Amino acid sequence: MADRADKAARSSVDPGEIARFSAMAAEWWDPAGKFRPLHKFNPTRLSYIRERTSAHFGLDARAVRPFEDLRFLDIGCGGGLLSEPMARLGAAMVSADASEQNIKTASVHAAEQGLGIDYRCTTAEALAAAGETFDVILNMEVIEHVADPMAFLKDCASMLRPGGLMFIATLNRTLKAHAFAIVGAEYVLGWLPRGTHDWKKFITVNEMETGIADAGLRLKELTGVSYNPLTDKWSLSRDTDVNYMALAERARD
């Protein structure tokens, strides 16, 4: 009980980050708007989640609704760009974000699509303190925006059921990432509003590996995600210098 109380009292929320994304909430579902990079990135991460989750739980990735028996958490869900496809694949979705505006936008859009997603304006530590548990946790492009990344990672990991999976996507704290993700994407190409990212809050691969182990999980896989300007598409790669995804699991009992 004391551990849950500590989690409830702690906050992963960075007010500046919440204000920044709340101001853009209405644009989540505009593929040509401020979240265009996420719309472009989405097919790659969706395919990765579908394939790895199906393989891990012995499911048929080609099935229409392969995730029907799984409970998912999309933490830092934003406007629901990941939550909606997962719901269509049958997952019982709990989608959380600390921005009330994001949750309102996501809820309205899901209702328009006829999707039953449990959207909540809350935090990882509050969900953990309430004793929530999940088979799969999607921790995508959020850890670099929280106040205490390693505490946030532990809170998320504490909600993972035995044998469960957590997907983590973030940016590496390298000079290359600063050049591509901040100077290039925000200042030169204008793909993202200036100030979207703070390079000092990026997570190195070594920090991620240590954080996953400290949270009681095992790292199954780590892969880079690279952008090809000639095709205007993202794909998995060996290059983890800028964008990368980590796949972690909790041991089965």
Curated annotation (Swiss-Prot):
GO terms for molecular function: 2-polyprenyl-6-hydroxyphenol methylase activity; 3-demethylubiquinol 3-O-methyltransferase activity; polyprenyldihydroxybenzoate methyltransferase activity. Pathway: Cofactor biosynthesis; ubiquinone biosynthesis. S-adenosyl-L-methionine binds at residues 45, 76, 97, 140. InterPro entries: Methyltransf_11, SAM-dependent_MTases_sf, UbiG_MeTrfase. It is an enzyme of class 2 (transferase). Keywords: Methyltransferase, S-adenosyl-L-methionine, Transferase, Ubiquinone biosynthesis. GO terms for biological process: methylation. It catalyses: a 3-demethylubiquinol + S-adenosyl-L-methionine = a ubiquinol + S-adenosyl-L-homocysteine + H(+); a 3-(all-trans-polyprenyl)benzene-1,2-diol + S-adenosyl-L-methionine = a 2-methoxy-6-(all-trans-polyprenyl)phenol + S-adenosyl-L-homocysteine + H(+). Its EC number is 2.1.1.222, 2.1.1.64. It comes from the Bacteria. It holds the Pfam family Methyltransf_11. SUPFAM superfamilies: S-adenosyl-L-methionine-dependent methyltransferases. O-methyltransferase that catalyzes the 2 O-methylation steps in the ubiquinone biosynthetic pathway. PANTHER family: METHYLTRANSFERASE, UBIQUINONE BIOSYNTHESIS O-METHYLTRANSFERASE, MITOCHONDRIAL. Belongs to the methyltransferase superfamily. UbiG/COQ3 family. This is Ubiquinone biosynthesis O-methyltransferase. The lineage of its organism: Bacteria, Pseudomonadati, Pseudomonadota, Alphaproteobacteria, Hyphomicrobiales. The gene is ubiG.
